[in-house]
Structures are given as structure tokens and as C-alpha cells.
Amino acid sequence: MSALLVIFALVLMITIFNTQSAYEEKEAAINEKNQMIEEVVGVKSEIIQELIKAFKDSDLAMEVDPQTGAIRFSGGVFFESNSSEVSPTGREYLEEFIPQYINILLSDRFRDEISQIIVEGHTDTAGGYLYNLQLSQDRALSVVQQIFQPTFPNFKYRGDLKSVITANGRSFSIPILKADGSIDANKSRRVEFKFRLKDDQLLDQLQGLGEKDGN
């Protein structure tokens, strides 16, 4: 009987030890994941704060999203209705905006963190989806082309920008809504400048794992 008790006690101790070890390993993995999330979120937050500070007193008709860092210009600033040619006013806006914007994103402080700088065109819901998809794509591309025109004033990091900038058209897939839930056609016609971090995909995966851990 005493031998059985000894065996039982040993098995119980091993089980408790293994359970404790597994718990500690899981706890360490969760802590490591949370630290990585904090680091990525911290970098993004720093960039957003720098953008807000740089443009808070700007006369440009633009908005900085405090959550994502996306910078939104009304479409009327750059383009006439149904046109993808950058207007003279739009060029003036770009000449003032781009050097400041790129000087932040591609500075020594943040350059290694940036995966993409995205110029994104959006339209209102007038007309068909495909027509507006083409129009929004053409507008985004026109903005990028304008930035690299030989007549556009030179700015710091212009050469580096070529490797990370992209132009996307979204048609009317992401409209801006009024308080009553209806579409604000004027605000929906817009151009947005966004940035994506190299660790954004990792952040999405880590946050997804966090949701699973919480279930």
C-alpha cells in the first residue's frame, strides 16, 4: 500500500510540475506578444503625433485621423468634377504638403519602420462602380505623377520615396457618412495619404492570437 502511495504522489507531483511549466510558458509567450504589440503601436502613435503637430496650424484644407494617421484632402482641392488632372491649386497644395509629410515618414527616426506610403483616391456614389474605380485610380496616380514631375520642387527623400509609394483607387467603397447615416457626397470625393508599417501585418496576426487567447 505504501508503495502505491509513493507512486501516486510522484505522478501527482510530475503532473503539477508539467502543468505549472506549461502555464509559465504560455504566460511568457503572452507577455512577449503583448510587448511586441506595444512596440508596434508605440511607433505608429509616435508618427501620428508628429503628423498632427506638423500640420495643426496648416492652412491646407486637410484632416489628420488621430487613430490611423491618414491625411484626408477633399477631392475638390485637387480635381475638377469627373477629371483626373491635378488642378493648379492642387499642385500648390502638394508642393507645400509633400515635403513636410515625407520628411516625417522617411526621417532617420521612422524610415526603417515604413513599408508603404499610399495615395488613395475615393469618389462619391454618382455613376457606376467601375467608372468610379477607374476615376479614383487615375486621380491617385495623377497625384503620384505630379510629385515626380521634373518641374515639381525638389524635396528631401524624393529618391527614397519611389521605393515605398503606391497609388490605389477605391471607387465609392468607403464613403464618408453624415451624422444621420446618409452619404456625404462632398467629403466622399477625396484623396487620402496613408502609411503602412512593416510590422502592421505582424500586429494584425498578434492581435488575432490575442482574441483567440481570450476566448
Question: Where are these predicted regions, by residue range?
Answer:
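Periplasmic peptidoglycan-binding/anchoring modules of Gram-negative envelope and division proteins
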Residues: 51, 64, 79, 83-118, ...
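Short N-terminal helix-initiation segments at or just after the protein's N-terminus
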Residues: 58-71, 114, 135-140, 199-201
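Surface-exposed acidic, glycine-flexible loop patches that form ligand/cofactor-binding
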Residues: 61-62, 106-111, 156-158, 182-183
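Soluble periplasmic/extracytoplasmic beta-strand elements of cell-envelope proteins
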Residues: 61-63, 70-78, 116-120, 166-168, ...
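Charged/polar helix/coil "stalk" or linker segments at domain boundaries
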Residues: 31, 42-77, 91-93
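Second-shell loop/turn segments in exported
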Residues: 33-40, 77-89, 128-134
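Periplasmic OmpA-like peptidoglycan-binding domain that tethers envelope proteins to the cell wall
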Residues: 88, 120-203, 209
